[in-house]
Amino acid sequence: MSKKNNCGNITRRKFIGNAAAGSAFIAAGPVTGFFSEGNQKNEAWPKDAVKYRFHMIGHGHIDPVWLWSWAEGVAIVHSTFRSALDRMNETPDFTFTTSSAQFFQWIAENDPAMLAEIRRRVEEGRWNLVGGWWVEPDMNIPSGEAMVRQGLYGQLTLEKLLGRRAVVATNPDSFGHANTLPQIIKLQGMENYIFMRPGPGEKTIPADLFWWEGPDGTKVLTYRIQLSYNNDGSVKSRIKNILDKATSQPMKSFMGYYGVGDHGGGATKVSIKSIEALKTEKGAPAVFFSTTDNYFREVRDDKKLILPVIKDDLQHHAVGCYTAEWEIKKNNRLSEAALVTAEKITSIGSKVWGANYPRKEFVSAWQRVLFLQFHDSLAGTSLFEHSQTAREGYGYALDIAGQATLLALQKLEWQVPAEDPSSQYLLVFNPHARDINSVIEYDLNQGKYLKSSRVEDEKGNPLLHQWVPGSTETGSRKKLVVSTAIPAFGYRQIRLFDGDPLISKETVKAEGNVMENKFLRVRFSGNGTIGIYDKEKGKEVFEGGATGCSAVIIDDPSDTWSHDIKSYSNEIGAFGNATIKVLENGPLRAKIRVRTEYGDSSLAIDWSLSSGSRNVEAKVTLDWHEHLKMLKFSFPVDVEAPVATYEIPYGHIVRVTNGDEDPGQRWIDLSGQKNGSRAGLTVINDAKYGYSVKGNDMRISVARSAVYAHHNPKVLDMNAEHLWMDQGIQTFRMLLVPHADTWKEINIPGIADEFTSPPLAIYQGIHGGSMPKSGSFLSVDAPNINVTAVKLSETGEDIIIRCVETSGSGVRATLDLRFAGSKWEGNFRPFEIKTLRLNFITKEIREVNLLEE
């Protein structure tokens, strides 16, 4: 929730007072004071007001968590719904609109009688179900698959509890909207969209009613709410304010939202009475109780109405939300990936090797994650106490996903023979639908293999490996680091035994401040910055040499949301005074630790380079103790005419390189020309969402130390105690991918998949078994088609397979479903999301929507 420019004519003090009073105050239906219509009858209407129509949308916006706990949010839902039902009993044509399947799930569990009452009003058409999602989430930070699940569990829950689904998607309070949403929304059974942010002062659009077109060509009819989704004051004044700018709009019909919100409440008695009075007022526009469904039906039926088409994303509002509260954001990324991986392995495992697919537990885990994606939670703009709630919720989801994955792989491992008692065995599993080559780490009892160890795959081919310090201080266990190929969505057994290790001509070494392999020379400066030299191309990756990953400090006095901020540019320092230490020196991997400091904070980055690799990996440990400052990592890529590409939910977007703060998913790429040839750098990470690019300087936002739930215009007393965000230790990983080909040609989305959902290794005991020592269950032949989800259907025992085109290029692809003895071949248009439903018994494969129908 952001209240900036959101309260119409009311003051912030009145808004906060209203939120604190809550819906119990609203239910009393005051008719004087703050909620009074005052002298509205004396306000003259514009001469042409009668030409316009106002669909009055009774609404009570509910933030289930924000300046209050989720427990209070549950109470707000109940009291707001009670108030709406009471108003319906009093006024026969009053209508009420609300979203969020989670709210109705709470009502179903705690007040079945109220749910039955709501269902009757839904059947009458007076209770308008909108949204179709589990909650109103952030619309930039969740992954594409999480947005799919918002609608899957939201729509199915609405239908189960209330007998119908939403046809209007709505996220009025979210802080920006990715341009891939139209396809997702439409494939969830909704044709229309409502938003409010960014407002007119943040993004200029040709009309508040328009066709929003996604990069795949899907369009949804979209409406931007004027002024606010809350109206606690004069209904007439609100309508007049909208009419003041109506001549610039192509339509004659508008939606007029009214009702107390944020802390719930809904329509008041006085606002309902004022609307009834306006129905007969001379010179007034047509004003009537209505629903969002009715509004969109009316404007769609107007065949003369010509509306603009917008193909952009809808940004920006409150850019600090991309970075605030690092732990919530990292746990969100980890939970999304863990649940997807668990579903993939257990769904196919249930059909092939008898693994358990814990359907109810997966649904529960997803619903917990989806709730925590509510915009004030995932954006980091809630009160401090919510951090613990979020930590527990993500832990719940990660535990369910982890246990399901472990037990399924154990079931597989027990059936793959590992019979030599003088050897140790690992089974490594690749959860992606393409072959990969990966470096695997696993702590083992090193024992007699300390001086003489050989590692082979299941065919007896030797594998390059090395030993590094393990995770214990007992001396008996070391970490085995081994490089191996793993088949597409499949597994391979590797064996460690006493013997001569593989001696490779292609090794890697580290000495002093330099590490080097066949392709790259990596060096570090006295300030801790990195230089990468491409030995094949004879080029430096960074402008000026060793200038990459400068840890830049920016003055950031903004509030939690960073209201009125477009970019973070006031640099006041940088981490420096580096100490450099070699940690590993081949033959498979070199690793150098670079420690720097700034103020009361310290930064340690373990940079690693593997034999034969063209990428540089970093494990970052930040101990942050700054206040009202921001940390960004700067990568000045040595290119001209730079083009910046950001991953967004189930897609990517090219944005201008003007330094503005932008949201992104796992990767950002900056490509251009250098001396007549192509060059570029992609940075992939497993935890961050805020980025900026100015010219050729690409930056990742690492930490913001604002105060929890601090909202302008409140001025902080710097002599008082405050709860500061992002303090202490945080860790995350990055992968730097320099390239001469385009990011599409080297398949950056696939590399990001492998980096953020790495292959899994499991220890094998000594036993027999009937399954082969390697196998592949599923693969796709087109590099720009990612298999993003494999799961059991929500109804029945079919297999759901979701694929996404990642490069923006149409392609014909073949899915080899070896686990089912079947294949599927079909065409993908650019950016298309395609969902297949496989009947494992009949082998029938059909294309379905995102609701699996």
Go through each PLM region and give its residues.
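N-terminal secretory signal peptides and thylakoid transit peptides that target proteins
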Residues: 2-23
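C-terminal segment of N-terminal export signals and the immediately downstream linker at the start
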Residues: 8, 30-53
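Catalytic grooves of carbohydrate-active enzymes
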Residues: 65, 218-418, 431-433, 595, ...
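Catalytic alpha-helical scaffold of carbohydrate-active enzymes acting on polysaccharides/glycoconjugates
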Residues: 49-54, 79-91, 107-165, 176-187, ...
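An acidic-aromatic substrate-binding cleft motif
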Residues: 45-67, 185, 513-524
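C-terminal (or distal) subdomains of carbohydrate-active enzymes
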Residues: 181-184, 206-209, 276, 281-286, ...
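Alpha-helical scaffold elements lining the catalytic groove of polysaccharide deacetylases
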Residues: 139-160, 226-246, 590
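The substrate-binding groove and active-site-proximal loops of carbohydrate-active enzymes
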Residues: 63-75, 100-107, 132-147, 165-175, ...
